[in-house]
């Protein structure tokens, strides 16, 4: 039995209560060839990007991966375990994505943080972050250095730290209880307090 951390953000551009920007959207017809996705917002610096396949058009397990992330866009493509399934070049999927401005406010325990962690591979790497009550942690590769499909696994979650590593989803390795040796990747880590995330849309007025 495993614990699953998740986050859901309404489509559009929002401001977190600490001033950071978060943008959520979906992209249709994502294939195994990279396509560029525009945020529709110009971040002040490169954000972290989280993606997830939101359809089942290929009929088997596929993963979505961001790469070439800039302050205004990123490239998006599918990956699958070619040794088990082969690669269906005609398959397309719908992918949901969230872009989060990096940083956070150390004194605001409910708002968490977003950061990019460099040089993560198949061995666990400890990551510290601003103290966040009831932390929910989402992590995803931000680069595509290794050729094998892989996910980021989190472990040892506390209110100010987590361990991350790259886990390859190769069927034959998994069947033998083994883990592949993966290349170093940049990993985006987003931390939120469990519960509703207070966001403000464009034009929101706050009376005090």
Where in the sequence are the language-model features?
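Extracellular receptor-binding modules and their adjoining Ser/Thr/Gly/Asp/Asn-rich linkers
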Residues: 1-208
